[in-house]
């Protein structure tokens, strides 16, 4: 087994780390370095804005809030997923509705999504697992109805 020789920084990484650690960072998603990342990322993707987050759970909250999911709404999520998907839905005041997954992929089953839709359905949350993608063509057809 090879001995661990420490981090191998090639550019300005150490300087950037020192800058962050020497500021009033306080573990929040703000600060000069964060703002620089958001601006550069937005430009790379030809967008006006980009928003960083500290976790996937935070991004789920942002997405649900951006789509106006709230009290009394239902969000269809896969029956096999991380708990945070359901937690994010609950925190918005909505109700997670679990759709079955396909036996061959363990991904959300578009046929079961159709069965779960009610007048209260506000969103469908897909989760891509194990290097596999959900059938987004079929899910989007359902979502657009």
Predicted regions: what they are:
Residues 104-145:
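Active-site phosphate-binding strand-loop segment of PLP-dependent enzymes
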Residues 15, 61, 86-87, 134-137:
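Alpha-helical elements of the RecA-like P-loop NTPase motor core of helicases
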Residues 21, 73, 117-118:
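Short, flexible helix/strand-to-coil boundary loops that buttress conserved ligand/catalytic motifs
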Residues 1-66, 70, 91-92, 126, ...:
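Conserved PLP-binding active-site segment in aminotransferase class I/II-type PLP enzymes
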Residues 45-47, 53-67, 71, 76-111, ...:
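Substrate-binding/gating loop at the entrance of the active-site cleft, primarily
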Residues 34-35, 82, 136:
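Generic non-transmembrane alpha-helix signal with a bias for helix starts/N-cap capping motifs
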Residues 30, 78, 132:
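Charged, low-complexity surface patches
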